[in-house]
Amino acid sequence: MPKVLVLYYSAYGHIETMANAVAEGARAAGATVDIKRVPELVSEEIAKKSHYKLDQAAPIAKIDDLADYDAIIVGTGTRFGRMSSQMAAFLDQAGGLWARGALNGKVGAAFTSSATQHGGNETTLFSIITNLLHFGLTIVGLPYSHAGQMTLEEITGGAPYGATTIAGGDGSRQPSQIELDGARHQGELVAKTAAKLFG
């Protein structure tokens, strides 16, 4: 039974919701799953003024936690076409793990959100995936076996590189059923891939 970490940063709750769906998919495939978040860099005062969602249940991750898992699925909102500074600052601390090869051969994946359809989801996925490849992870995307990402019936996230959601400019749009199904599907695929590699 593979051990999977869903590691995320969520300012407004959209990625937290996606992280829970990713975890559901991995658990459905038989994995043991932990959901953890990275530390907030913004002061509590500014976070409150900006209406950040501060009541998130997931515990704060420590960088050495990464070595304890067979698979690591990373999610963060898009910040100007790349991952958030909170996630980048966390992953930048993994130099010691990288130097020891502690993450080599693990399974990795990425998911994200943006305000608009063309708001940088794919480039953000690439920024996460690039980090994971440098760490030595084998990447699992979101293939078109998740047919929902092909729909033209509604605005929806999803890319072959990872699950995505679109939050809207004011953050009022929550992840749709199609987007949550994509997140679950990706979590399931990661768990199945890790099971093949690690038993």
Curated annotation (Swiss-Prot):
Which EC class is this protein assigned? oxidoreductase
> Any idea what this protein is called?
NAD(P)H dehydrogenase (quinone)
Membership in a protein family: Belongs to the WrbA family.
User: Which residues participate in NAD(+) binding?
Assistant: Y12
Mind listing the UniProt keywords for this protein, alphabetically?
Flavoprotein, FMN, NAD, NADP, Nucleotide-binding, Oxidoreductase
NCBIfam families (alphabetical): flav_wrbA, PRK03767.1
| Cofactor requirement | FMN
Q: How is the cofactor bound?
A: Binds 1 FMN per monomer.
Which EC numbers characterise this protein's activity in its record? 1.6.5.2
